[in-house]
Amino acid sequence: VSAPTPSRVLTQNAVTGAWLSTALPVCQLEYGDELNGPGSLSGTLAPRLLSSNPALADPGNTFIYVESGGQLVWGGIVWDVRTQGSEYAIEAASWSSYLQRRYDLDGEFGGRGPYTYADRCHVLRDIWTYAQSIADGDLGVVVDSTTSTSTIGTPADVYHSYSYDVNCLGDKADDLVSGDATPDYTCTTAWNADKTAVVKRIRLGWPRLGRRRTDISFSSGVNIIEDPEIALGGDDYAQVVIASGAGDGSAKLRQISAVRNGRLRLEAAIDAPELNGNDTLKARAEAERGWRQVLGSVDQITIRNTTAAPFGSWQTGDDVYTRVHNQWGSFTGWCRVTGSTVKPEAQGGPQAVISLKPSSMYNYGGVS
């Protein structure tokens, strides 16, 4: 299997849209996507290049793209350029990072709020619409029209965004996707049909992004090329889970899932106010206990390009069966891809670093 290698790196003025470079010579290039985050890009440039034309990668004012096989595979904003020995180190993050530099100066996202029982996807779109409605603030980002049943705000606790709030728009957007049974998002970039313009997209998923993959796998001795750390952490371990659901005070629903297994009793509490039935709350508590009782997890692996999981075959949010066997121990199980970084110039050939979380940690739409 031949790994796709970047054919070129392009940069563009963020305000005027003028192309600054259609073949920027970036070395040590690394780039990738992230679940519910912007993902990142890093690399180095020759100092003489930037000294002769600083606008090629002007921090905070430049879009940067990676093209492979004639298709854009990553895009974002250059945020940092600094000297590093005899080179310039460049760092960028994808589209949602822009909201970390914007605030709700008008309140209620320019009059689009407040919100009661509002679809979180709708509020997320309102945040982007507001941010891009201000002069010099339009990235051209399109947010999916996905809808969900995950809501925010109640008559007793209306969701507001005040003009004096010091939390940036990025923090408000993150809050909408940070809980259990909330929508997912990731940033994507592509050419339009005739390759005359860039499509910048916030891809929304409900009840989730990604799917369980039976056609690819990550395995030691097959495509995992380094011995990953198998973490045995007691901080997350619990054989007793207390789940709180809808309601307030003494009327708040509560279910406990507990077993005795010869180990020191450890408890964990979770809050799931979106669950208003004891049966669903009990199922949620049992699912939570299920993954917390498993000692051992793999948070990151490095793979090479093989038929077992060709580069580009997985999507952010996918569940992939993972097998790790080394002298320290073994781990097998379904893991969710929460991010990946492609290193096309890695020593020995292209590599991808995959960030993982146990699939059993996640609950989608209130159902595990």
Role assignments for model-derived ranges:
Residues 1-120:
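Beta-strand-rich assembly/attachment modules of structural machines
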Residues 22-28, 78, 155-160, 222-227, ...:
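A broad structural signal for short, well-ordered beta-strand segments within beta-sheet-rich domains
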Residues 33, 81-82, 189-193, 231-235, ...:
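A general structural signal for short secondary-structure junctions and capping/turn motifs
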Residues 65-93, 322-352:
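Short beta-strand and beta-hairpin "edge-sheet" elements
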